[in-house]
Amino acid sequence: IVGEKYVEKNALEKSLPFEEYCDLLVPDTVEFENLINAATTNETYFFREKAHFEFLQKTILPFYRGKELVVWSGACSSGEEPISLYALLKFWGVKPKIYASDIDSNELDLFKKGVYSKYSFNVDGKEFHKILEETKTGSFENEKFILNQDVFNHITVKQFNLAGKRLPDFFDKADIIFLRNVFIYFDNNLRKEVLNLAAEKLAPGGLIFLSVSEICCIDSDLIPDSMEKVNNGSTYFLMKKDGTKSVLINTI
């Protein structure tokens, strides 16, 4: 709906028929990128859906102390998710190698600036907020959180369209992939395609996290053959089951 209103408004401003303006919406053009930025919803906050972070710190991260863990945040918006992951890994003595991508260039620009207001914080995940400063991920100044730019030595930020039907080429394999709060934009066919592509970029035994509201709607026919839906208590995720069993599998 937002996208349609944007197209109608811009067609009127340019005095073009609706169909003619639509012809201008070609990928990799300014018009198309502006449409994407207008149509995407970017509500996010630090340590959103805290159960995922609790699971990581109780079940996975203790086994990775002193080791590198590769994580892809595939719909990172303005950066709260990958920053949360970075801080948690640092807190547990894990070497973070994080790739963060999103389709919205405006949100990625906000991420790179690294200035966050109170709206990036929620009661959900509140107990983790203190580690943002404890790990020197950033500092709280004048009711804002200011990101330490050194974080970008460990977080690579890229613009990437999950619906583009191609594999991300900016990393090899990830141990953990976060694809949360993005499947609401996709139909089942696209969800299946995205999960298949993500599975190809996942190391054996690796995990994919969807949002709590999304993973319950993922039927077995959408899950790649190389993956299975697994739960640890009330926390559900997808696990890559082929290949040599990794530390991730052995700890669950």
Give residue ranges: language-model regions.
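Conserved AdoMet
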Residues: 1-70
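Conserved beta-strand signature within the Rossmann-like core of class I S-adenosyl-L-methionine
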Residues: 204-212
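Extended basic-aromatic, gly/pro-enriched interface segments that bind polyanionic ligands
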Residues: 97-178, 182-186, 190, 216, ...
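A structural alpha-helix within SAM-dependent methyltransferase catalytic domains
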Residues: 57, 61, 86-90, 199
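Conserved class I S-adenosyl-L-methionine
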Residues: 67-78, 99
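Conserved SAM-binding loop of SAM-dependent methyltransferases across substrates and taxa
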Residues: 78-92
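Core SAM-dependent methyltransferase catalytic element
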Residues: 176, 225-252
